[in-house]
Swiss-Prot record:
Name of the protein described by the UniProt record: Glycerol-3-phosphate acyltransferase
Pfam families, A to Z: Acyltransferase, GPAT_C
Naturally occurring in which organism (per UniProt): Pseudomonas syringae pv. syringae (strain B728a)
Chain positions of motif HXXXXD motif: 309-314
Record flagged with keyword Cell inner membrane: yes
Domain notes: The HXXXXD motif is essential for acyltransferase activity and may constitute the binding site for the phosphate moiety of the glycerol-3-phosphate.
Pathway annotation from the record: Phospholipid metabolism; CDP-diacylglycerol biosynthesis; CDP-diacylglycerol from sn-glycerol 3-phosphate: step 1/3
Molecular function GO terms recorded: glycerol-3-phosphate O-acyltransferase activity
Keyword field: Acyltransferase, Cell inner membrane, Cell membrane, Lipid biosynthesis, Lipid metabolism, Membrane, Phospholipid biosynthesis, Phospholipid metabolism, Transferase
Length: 833
């Protein structure tokens, strides 16, 4: 087409005419530099002949500064008049396809590289998508226009250009280096066939990743579930158990399937894209996306399961929007049945949501239908999204993973592992969450209300506020097969029956949940709200003067940059001053001026709200805060002392906050933090020991503020131990200890003026007690009562002296003693009665 000057003139004219209507964009600009050697010749591989595709690719190459496909290129002595070829040859005049031969250009390139050891050629697979439709067979109209798995004719392509040309996307992939393939010394013919095979597999996987796998209509999928052995058996058992006919049980199963299944509709996806583009840029200050290129690399050829943290109802919409905008198929999303509300439920279902009940208990037929539906999605390669936390986090911290969906995923993979599964953690960070005021009420003890359509209007009423920016970070992928290889090396040899439940499933699922939570926290997006919250909530009066606040924020930024939490963690740009101005602009910081300057403070309402944003990043500050705590009671400590107490307390912090480092890496990380402290003047290293600054110094004030980030967490730990020790051996059950801890924490929060309702969160005490049991610190007797090691008191007191002030320890012991006396009085009264 572009071999002669005349044809190039015609091509240029056609391209200009095409772009009177067409608008195109490249999906992944970052891939342009991925292993691309600009000194080596570049060829572009297109899947099938299309002058419109070539015109779009040529335009995108010009925009990106890449070599153009329509210009000549040299490989040694070989001069090719154009730098592109079609993997599938053009049909002959009778429309017949020649599937035997390789593209002539590719044949000549392979020969040139084979014959000249110093030469190389880079082949970039490139695809053009006219529209991006994830539902393949639900509409004849969309099948006619959007890219699909059907062969596209000239008339269909013309209509596609007219209808979808303004939403055209180009995907450039990493180049294939011919020198590497030729270097395998397999001969010309085999190298040629190997190159063709690589390109064919690449195009097939890429198409699946971008426009979605080939899928039947929703009705066909739901009806197909009823013919699966697992569901058929459940129908028979349901009929016997409920004393109904099998036909009636089958109808019940069908109704469950219709209740569950999504109804992906492309028009809704496009509608949401338009609406949400306005929303993110009108309500929020846009979206900052990090590390999505890792998803684009791993998605082809994998069943992708997105596992985001859950902070807001708009999480459902946000991830689908971002994936669609970045050329990836929006996932099928697990949503609670409570969201299947009038109007909203239908919209969510057409946007990819499938609905699940909060509990499957007592309904084996529903369980079978739901399990089989998920299995169908997995084996067909549909991207899926679910929240391992179960519900939205009201406290801002990562919730303990709910393992139900993970267990279903694991069992499905054990049944059929042909499609490799990869989990993609997605951290979603809001500078201001839409439901913030609702969470504020719930944190203060208000009963959690059931969602309704009217909640939307409450949120809309708050939209006049400034909400800042949204950050979305994609974390390190977790490949399920590799995870299982580490946990259960013989998993491939075990039976594949749908009912198979290996003994190790529960424990392995629990560890998978922990791994996902850790990877989510690794991808945290630290924002100005988080840092200001950490700083002000560490003060006694929730206030700092303007200059001191700037110094604290500058210190935190410096420390976090010196000791990065993980490669996937992101930090805000700018310095402490810019962070202060940013948060002030969101009306969350109050300001008071006097003759000495400005004081920044939090009012009572915002102080509680800011605990949410502090908790988002508490896992990042936990270890440096713990190290700083050691120097509140001790003026000097050796490295060995620091490591000993850190190792003693770290497992409990790690378990609660899902901190990333295993115990065998802890010493190195502690050394990095100590070095950073010394660099910033927070500590001095003198005579084989670390020495704190003078108590009257500015550096000691900074060290003290840093130590308070996890002070309440450490107090809760000490509180539980104190109550247990006061009660004695084999006296309390875990549930009784949990209740006592909650009451004691409420009392202490009043006595010490702690305005943080999560301080007496029952679930945190429950998890700490379970961690003590898991680590063998506590044991349960036959009656379910707790016993502990005789040295527990001495060890706990020794650690507490290092991290908690004497007055706090004394107050906790006194309240614990008083609580124990009250418990004994209640027991005596009940016995007398």
């Amino acid at each position: 087409m572009t071999r002669s000057p005349f044809r190039r003139l015609v091509f240029g004219t056609l391209r200009r005419l095409l772009y009177l209507w067409v608008r195109s964009e490249t999906i992944n600009q970052s891939s342009f530099t991925l292993n691309l050697d600009r000194s080596r010749p570049v060829f572009y591989a297109l899947q099938s002949p299309s002058i419109s595709d070539l015109a779009v690719i040529d335009t995108e190459c010009r925009k990106a500064g890449l070599p153009r496909p329509v210009l000549s290129v040299a490989v040694g002595n070989l001069i090719e008049p154009a730098a592109f070829f079609y993997l599938t040859p053009s049909p002959d005049w009778l429309g017949r396809q020649d599937k035997r031969g390789a593209p002539p250009t590719l044949e000549r390139v392979v020969a040139a590289v084979s014959q000249n050891p110093g030469e190389d050629a880079q082949i970039i697979p490139v695809s053009v998508f006219w529209g991006q439709s994830p539902d393949r067979e639900s509409s004849a109209w969309k099948l006619l226009f959007a890219d699909s798995w059907a062969v596209t004719g000239r008339l269909r392509r013309l209509v596609s250009i007219l209808i979808l040309g303004r939403k055209t996307r180009v995907q450039f992939s990493a180049p294939i280096h011919m020198r590497e393939l030729v270097g395998e010394n397999k001969g010309y013919e085999l190298t040629l066939r190997m190159t063709q095979r690589l390109l064919r597999v690449h195009f097939r996987n890429l198409k699946s990743a971008v426009i979605g796998p080939d899928v039947s209509h929703r009705r066909t999928v739901v009806k197909g579930l009823l013919d699966e052995p697992l569901v058929k058996q459940a129908i028979i058992e349901e009929a016997e158990r409920e004393h109904i006919t099998q036909e009636k049980a089958r109808e019940r199963a069908l109704s469950y399937g219709n209740e569950i299944a999504s109804d992906y509709t492309y028009s809704v996806i496009r509608f949401m894209e338009v609406v949400l583009s306005w929303f993110w840029n009108k309500i929020y200050d846009g979206i900052k996306v990090s590390h999505i290129e890792g998803v684009q690399e791993v998605a082809p050829g994998h069943e992708v399961i997105y596992v985001p943290c859950h902070r807001s109802h708009i999480d459902y919409l946000l991830l689908s929007y971002l994936l669609f905008r970045n050329g990836l198929t929006p996932p099928h999303i697990a949503a609670g049945i409570n969201l299947n509300m009038p109007v909203v439920g239908g919209l969510l279902r057409r946007g990819g949501a499938f609905f699940m009940r909060r509990t499957f208990k007592g309904n084996p037929l529903y369980t079978a239908v739901f399990t089989e539906y998920l299995h169908t999605l997995f084996i067909k390669g549909f991207p899926v999204e679910y929240f391992v936390e179960g519900g939205r986090s009201r406290t801002g911290r990562m919730l303990q993973p709910k393992t139900g969906m993970l267990a279903i995923t694991l069992r499905s993979f054990l049944r059929n592992s042909r499609m490799p599964i990869v989990f993609i953690p997605v951290y979603i960070g809001y500078e201001r969450v839409l439901e913030g005021r609702t969470y504020l009420g719930e944190l203060r003890g208000a009963t959690k209300k059931k969602e309704s359509i009217f909640d939307i209007f409450k949120v809309i009423g708050a939209l006049k506020q400034r909400f800042g920016q949204v950050s979305v970070n994609f974390g390190a992928p977790i490949k399920l097969a590799e995870f299982l290889d580490g946990e259960q090396p013989d998993w491939r040899e075990q039976q594949l029956d749908p009912q198979f439940r290996p003994e190790w499933l529960s424990e392995t699922t629990h560890r998978l949940g922990e791994r996902v939570a850790q990877h989510l926290n690794e991808a945290a997006a630290v924002n100005p709200m988080n840092l200001v919250a950490v700083a002000l909530l560490s003060t006694q009066r929730l206030a700092l003067d303007d200059q001191a606040m700037e110094r604290v924020l500058d210190l935190y930024l410096t420390l976090l940059r010196a000791v990065p939490y993980s490669p996937h963690t992101t930090l805000p740009e700018g310095d402490g001053r810019s962070l202060i101005e940013h948060v002030k602009g969101m009306d969350l910081l109050a300001e008071q001026k006097d003759a000495l300057g400005k004081i920044l403070y939090l009012n009572e309402q915002n102080a509680v709200l800011m605990t949410y944003y502090r908790n988002n990043v508490l896992h990042i500050f936990a270890l440096p805060s713990l190290l700083a705590s050691f120097f509140q009671s001790s003026s000097r400590m050796t490295r060995e002392q620091i490591l000993r107490y850190t190792r003693a307390l770290y497992p409990f912090l790690q378990s609660e906050l899902f901190i990333r480092w295993p115990l065998n890496e802890l010493d190195d990380v502690v050394d990095q933090w100590l070095a950073a402290f010394v660099e910033q003047g927070l500590l001095r290293f003198k005579k084989d020991a670390y020495v704190r600054p003078e108590p009257s110094s500015r550096e000691f004030v900074l060290l003290t503020l840093l130590s308070r980030a996890i002070a309440q967490t450490l107090q809760r730990f000490y509180m539980a131990i104190a109550l247990l020790l006061n009660s004695g051996q084999n006296t309390l059950s875990p549930e009784q200890l949990e209740d006592l801890c909650t009451v004691m924490a409420q009392r202490l929060s009043i006595l010490h003026g702690l305005n943080a309702p999560e301080f007496f969160d029952k679930s945190l005490f429950r998890h700490f007690i379970q961690t003590l049991l898991d680590l063998g610190v506590l044991r349960k007797d036959s009656a379910g009562k707790l016993s502990y090691h005789p040295m527990l008191g001495e060890l706990a007191e020794g650690a507490a002296k290092r991290v908690l002030p004497a007055e706090i320890r004394l107050s906790i012991r006194q309240v614990a003693l008083h609580s124990n006396e009250e418990e004994q009085d209640v027991g005596t009264d009940q016995g007398a009665a």
